[in-house]
Swiss-Prot record:
Naturally occurring in which organism (per UniProt): Odocoileus hemionus
Complexes and interactors: Monomer and homodimer. Has a tendency to aggregate into amyloid fibrils containing a cross-beta spine, formed by a steric zipper of superposed beta-strands. Soluble oligomers may represent an intermediate stage on the path to fibril formation. Copper binding may promote oligomerization. Interacts with GRB2, APP, ERI3/PRNPIP and SYN1. Mislocalized cytosolically exposed PrP interacts with MGRN1; this interaction alters MGRN1 subcellular location and causes lysosomal enlargement. Interacts with KIAA1191.
Propeptide, residue positions: 234-256
Glycosylation sites: 184, 200
Compartment(s): Cell membrane; Golgi apparatus
Gene Ontology biological process terms in this record: protein homooligomerization
Annotated GO MF terms: copper ion binding
Name of this chain's protein: Major prion protein
Amino acid sequence: MVKSHIGSWILVLFVAMWSDVGLCKKRPKPGGGWNTGGSRYPGQGSPGGNRYPPQGGGGWGQPHGGGWGQPHGGGWGQPHGGGWGQPHGGGGWGQGGTHSQWNKPSKPKTNMKHVAGAAAAGAVVGGLGGYMLGSAMNRPLIHFGNDYEDRYYRENMYRYPNQVYYRPVDQYNNQNTFVHDCVNITVKQHTVTTTTKGENFTETDIKMMERVVEQMCITQYQRESQAYYQRGASVILFSSPPVILLISFLIFLIVG
C-alpha cells in the first residue's frame, strides 16, 4: 500500500516537472520573435535588443509614432518631424534643425599666438624704427608771453598731439637727449599725418606744438625713468645672496 502511494507521488512530480519544462519552451522570450523587437542576430546590437528598436507606439508601417510614410512623427515626405526640405526637427532649408548647420560658415578661431604677440608688443609703433607711443595726456596750459598767442593756443590746442613717441630711457644718457629726440619724432610724425589729411600748419602752430610736445616729453621721461628704476631695484633685491638663500630655505620647507 505504501509502495503504491510512493509510486503515485513520484508519477505526479514527474508530470508536473514535464509540464513546467514544456511551458518554458513554448513561452515567448521578451522582445523576441519576428517584428517584436527581438534580435534575429544576437551578435549585432545590444543583448536582447533589436538592431532597429522601435521608438514609440507605431503600428505596421508606422515606425516611431507616425502615420504611413511618416517616420519619426512627421507628415508625408516629412522625415523626423520637419516640413518638406526640413530634415531632423523642423529647421528651414539649409538649417538642418538640431543637426549641424552645413550651410552656415564656421566662425574663425582666434589665433592665440597673434593675441600674445600683440600683448607683448605693447606700445611699439610699427614703421617708426622702434619708437613707442605713450599714453594720452591732457594738453598743458602754457603761456606764450602775449595775449594773441595765448588766445591762439586755447583755440587751436585740439589740433596738437596729446601723445608722444619715444624710445626706452635706457638708450639715452640724460633727460635732455630723450626730450630732444621725443619732440623731433612726435612733431614730425604729427605734421606728416595731418598734412596728408589736407590740413597745414603755420609757423605759429609749429612753435606752439613744439612747446606743448616738449612738456609732454618731460612728463613721459619722468614716468619711464621711475618705472625703469623700480624694475631695476626689484631685480637687485631678488638677486642678492641673502634673499636667494631665504627663498631657497622656504622652498625646502614647503617641498620637504
